[in-house]
């Protein structure tokens, strides 16, 4: 069983992760959006990776300063999770 530590410091079982998504996050308010709109202040904009669980919860896994860092982290995380599932068979 693999565990992962979330952005908030919570530890969760990777088996409950249904999907991983790249999002934008307002670090002042904590609001998350799939697209940047006029309500986002560029000075407070960060790039985040979230996970939807099998229970329907959205959890912030990590926050990054650049879009490139976020996308690379998502790629690595998705490969790590797929490798883990494949290792059971």
Functional labels for PLM-detected ranges:
Residues 1-89:
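Eukaryotic intrinsically disordered, low-complexity regulatory linkers and tails enriched in Ser/Thr/Pro
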């Amino acid at each position: 069983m693999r565990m992962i530590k979330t952005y908030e410091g919570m530890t969760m079982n990777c088996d409950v992760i249904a999907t991983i998504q790249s999002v934008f996050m307002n670090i002042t308010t904590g609001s998350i959006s799939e697209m940047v709109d006029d309500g986002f202040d560029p000075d407070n904009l960060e790039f985040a990776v979230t996970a939807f669980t099998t229970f329907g919860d959205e959890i912030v896994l990590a926050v990054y300063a650049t879009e490139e860092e976020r996308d690379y982290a998502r790629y690595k995380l998705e490969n790590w999770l797929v490798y883990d599932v494949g290792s059971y068979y």
